[in-house]
Swiss-Prot record:
The kinase domain is likely to have lost catalytic activity but retains ATP-binding activity. ATP structurally stabilizes the kinase domain. ATP binds at residues 200, 202, 204, 270, 272, 279, 341. Mg(2+) binds at residue 339. This is Scaffold protein ILK. The gene is ILK. Scaffold protein which mediates protein-protein interactions during a range of cellular events including focal adhesion assembly, cell adhesion and cell migration. The keyword RNA-binding does not apply.
Length: 452
């Protein structure tokens, strides 16, 4: 079978759908020139493939090696329907490539009048100069030039030339496609890993930053007493199920390495510059999580969980809390598969009881409905996102576990929280597990909240 880039170029929707259904495939990977599948589908005008990729979570503002976004390519080739779709999904309309050109520069240069008018109507600036000091208006022929000027003035644009400068867009992070070869290699040669910095250590192991095959990664060393052949066999069986590349809100385990040759069994995953949601909310990173960002994170997490809940069987021993959610370079929240526990890791121990449903604290794992218990954990995350506080911060884990399970301890919703979020929190935290909603029911609710 041809590769995914060819299928997207040729608009082979059936093949693309089959490829997307395989959890080992990462739809945000790039080819040798940094073109993602979405770049190719937009360039060639393959509307149905574009729809499918966007619905599965393709990154809209991803850039190839020349810093072109999919909108640059759709605009240069005059695919009006795709341009409108990308705008609808919040494409950066004034994105600048390595020549300083915006999508509007190309629509004007190639004479795609309707596309150029659509872009201006949606906020594309007519007077941004590229590296060669040319604006989109300079690139347009008559009568388009006059139409765009008039349109821009009506919309309140200032027609004074905005000079090109490198730093103009440095506020926006450049999102590149990921290296597509990483999902092909499950077993890892320990000698190829370089460890640079120890990030953390706790009872279950050590966390290191390192590099592998030219990529920044996180290496998790598991401290396991009495490493036996049985445990080694379980490890080999369990970690490949955590290599889920096919959803943008799930962070896969890239691979693993046995002990020996490694000093401890290790799993590796992509390095996330912002760390976990817990770091972002409670440990003072550079950015502020306002209500809009909080809802966006909640939406990301709900989408990731809705996907994980479609898997049969469910991923066992996955605990949803703010430490097991990572924040990607483009501020996307991703559920970390490297935080799933292995069957031989302290069975029966609760690491973060503040996020655990009361019934899960009282009963054996096989006696509860895991999907409903996850929804409770999500409600605690919602509480944490809007209050920016650690749940039950003044109690020890032991006390939290006892009080939530036996004394009815619950997070209290402070005044001043948006009524929509308040209501959602309450339905997700229903005392009766059977009455809690499913994730696919709350994704559309959060999507509407984002648009408000």
């Amino acid at each position: 079978m041809d590769d995914i880039f060819t299928q997207c170029r040729e608009g082979n929707a059936v093949a693309v759908r089959l490829w997307l259904d395989n959890t080992e495939n990462d739809l945000n990977q790039g080819d040798d020139h940094g073109f993602s599948p979405l770049h190719w589908a937009c360039r060639e005008g393959r509307s149905n493939v574009v729809d499918m990729l966007i619905m599965r979570g393709a990154r809209i503002n991803v850039m190839n090696r020349g810093d072109d976004t999919p909108l640059h390519l759709a605009a240069s080739h005059g695919h009006r329907d795709i341009v409108q779709k990308l705008i609808q999904f919040k494409a950066d309309i004034n994105a600048v490539n390595e020549h300083g050109n915006t999508p509007l520069h190309y629509a004007c240069f190639w004479g795609h009048d309707t596309v150029a008018e659509d872009l201006v109507g949606n906020g594309a600036l007519v007077s941004i100069a590229n590296k060669y000091s040319e604006t989109p208006i300079d690139k347009a022929k008559m009568p388009l030039r006059e139409i765009l000027k008039e349109r821009a003035e009506k919309l309140g644009q200032n027609l004074t030339k905005i000079p090109y400068k490198d730093t103009f867009w440095k506020g926006t992070t450049r999102t590149r496609p990921r290296n597509g070869t990483l999902n092909k290699l499950a077993g890892i040669d320990f000698k190829q890993l370089s460890l640079s910095q120890k990030l953390n250590e706790n009872q279950s192991g050590e966390l290191w930053k390192g590099r592998w095959q030219g990529n920044d990664i996180v290496i998790k060393m598991l401290k396991i007493r009495d490493w036996t052949t049985r445990k080694s066999r379980d490890f080999n069986e369990e970690y490949p199920k955590l290599r889920i590349f096919s959803h943008p809100n799930v962070l896969p385990v890239l691979g693993a390495c046995q002990s020996p040759p490694a000093p401890h069994p290790i799993v590796i995953s992509h390095w996330m510059p912002y760390g976990s949601l817990y770091n972002v909310l409670h440990e003072g990173t550079n950015f502020v999580v306002d209500q809009m960002q909080a809802v966006k994170f909640a939406f990301d997490i709900a989408r990731g969980m809705a996907f994980l809940h479609t898997l049969e069987p469910l991923i066992p021993r996955h605990h949803l809390n703010s430490r097991s959610i990572m924040i990607d370079e483009d501020m996307t929240a991703r559920i970390s598969m490297a935080d799933v526990k292995f069957s031989f890791q302290c069975p029966g121990r609760m690491y973060a009881p503040a996020w655990v449903a009361p019934e899960a604290l009282q009963k054996k794992p096989e006696e509860i409905n895991r999907r409903s218990a996850d929804m409770w954990s999500f409600a605690v995350l919602l509480w944490e996102l809007v209050t920016r506080e650690v749940p039950f911060a003044d109690l020890s884990n032991m006390e939290i576990g006892m009080k939530v399970a036996l004394e009815g301890l619950r997070p209290t919703i402070p005044p001043g929280i948006s009524p929509h979020i308040c209501k959602l929190m309450k339905i997700c935290m229903n005392e009766d597990p059977a009455k809690r909603p499913k994730f696919d029911m709350i994704v559309p609710i959060l999507e509407k909240m984002q648009d408000k």
